[in-house]
Amino acid sequence: MALSLPPRPALLFLVLMSVTLMASAFPQPQLRPLQSNLPAIGQEDSKGEQWEVVYPSISLRDWSIQMLTAPDFGAAKTGREQLVADDWLPLSQSQMEEELVKGWTGDWPSRVGHQQKRNIVVADDAAFREKSKLLTAMERQKWLNSYMQKLLVVNSK
């Protein structure tokens, strides 16, 4: 006699069976039972409790860890060739804004009214997109907020 179930319970049964089979395909941990040498209730034990530590099957010994070789930087640079800390540290928010403001104006020809403002916004947007690849989301939001405040000040004059 064939197993005849409605579609939903049959699907549920198949899913449960497949999960069971998939889980049984993984190596099972060799857990040892916890052993305690507890005295009977009401009796004192001078040795104290001794518990055996049980490690799960997923531990560092199961992972193959490969160390990468250190890159060869050659001899240490001396004098002026040595990097100054400021050369490689990331820029602060104010320094990024200053650098972006320097690059915004450029050598654009002056145009009349809204056309000039539109070009500035388009160029600023392109600069923002290029620079934002290097920024985190929070830094990007701060930069955008400060830019919008500056834009409101410029437009209000």
Swiss-Prot record:
Protein name, UniProt field: Tuberoinfundibular peptide of 39 residues
Keyword match Lipid biosynthesis: no
Family: Belongs to the parathyroid hormone family.
Gene behind this protein: pth2
Key words, A-Z: Cleavage on pair of basic residues, Neuropeptide, Secreted, Signal
GO function term, MF aspect, one: receptor ligand activity
GO cellular component terms listed in the entry, alphabetical order: extracellular region
Keyword Signal assigned: yes
Organism, as annotated: Danio rerio (Zebrafish)
GO biological process: adenylate cyclase-activating G protein-coupled receptor signaling pathway; neuropeptide signaling pathway; startle response; swimming behavior
Signal peptide limits: 1-25
Location in the cell: Secreted
Pfam name, any one: TIP39
Task of the protein: Plays a role as a potent and selective agonist of pth2r resulting in adenyl cyclase activation and intracellular calcium level elevation.
Record InterPro entries: TIP39 (IPR029396)
Propeptide: 26-116
Induction / repression: Up-regulated in the developing brain by shh signaling.
Principal location class: secreted
